[in-house]
Amino acid sequence: MKIIRSIKEMQGFSESARKQGKTIAFVPTMGFLHDGHLHLIRQARTMGDFLIVSIFVNPIQFGPTEDFKQYPRDWDRDAHLCESGGADVIFAPTVEEMYPEGFQTNITVPHVSQNLCGLSRPTHFQGVATVVAKLFNCTKPHVALFGEKDFQQLAVIKRMVLDLNVDIHIIGVPTVREAEGLAMSSRNTYLSTAERRSALSLSKALLKAQELFQSGERNARVLIDTAQAIITIEEGTTIDYIKVCDTETLQDVAIISKPAVMALAVKIGKARLIDNVVLKE
């Protein structure tokens, strides 16, 4: 496995692979890998001749009061997991390499960015779209995989790729969960034992909403109120949002008449956790 930190070297590697007729699969990460990332990496391994995994904690997607400096990092463990998952290359640039002095270009995908996490993190998806566009230009993949746990992020990337005619196939991979249902996240490490118990209410709330939907309930307010009751009864939970939205536009839906996503964000202790479930017949 090769470790590349220079953009020029990364581009050279990918250009050479493409000239040989090889396909490139790409998994972008911020490191501190867990089984959810490993699932993405192993799936990507089957989709290309070469597999590139990026590890880059992107400062421009964090707000001024968010956890950029505290975000967990473990390079040695991440490198081992990438190798065990079959990665050919880890692309791990520095912040200075990605954003040199004078950098000033940003990509905004306004409509799908506005709702959900965009309400409380107004610059987050601008940072996500910008770094992903740069990573695509560095790694030059044919296919890129993203987890569906970050449903809004996936929607933003799909919209950007569509609007800018980026010739990369974007694949969403279902959320990987711990045995008790908690969606895997690097931020789960922030949780104490008691907070982890409270966090299980997120998946329980989504599961109950899904059961109601499958039983015929189409009123989004009923589903939201049900989920809210399950979460608020747990100690230490502060709901940022619970919403039911159109799966493509991410605009709020009152009555569910086509596929929708119930998405939520909840603060528990130091962690802000997100999760979602798609509601479709």
For the regions a language model picked out, list residue spans one by one.
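Nucleotidyltransferase catalytic core that binds NTPs
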Residues: 2-236, 245-249, 278
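Phosphate/ribose-recognition catalytic cores of enzymes acting on nucleotide-derived substrates
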Residues: 226-281
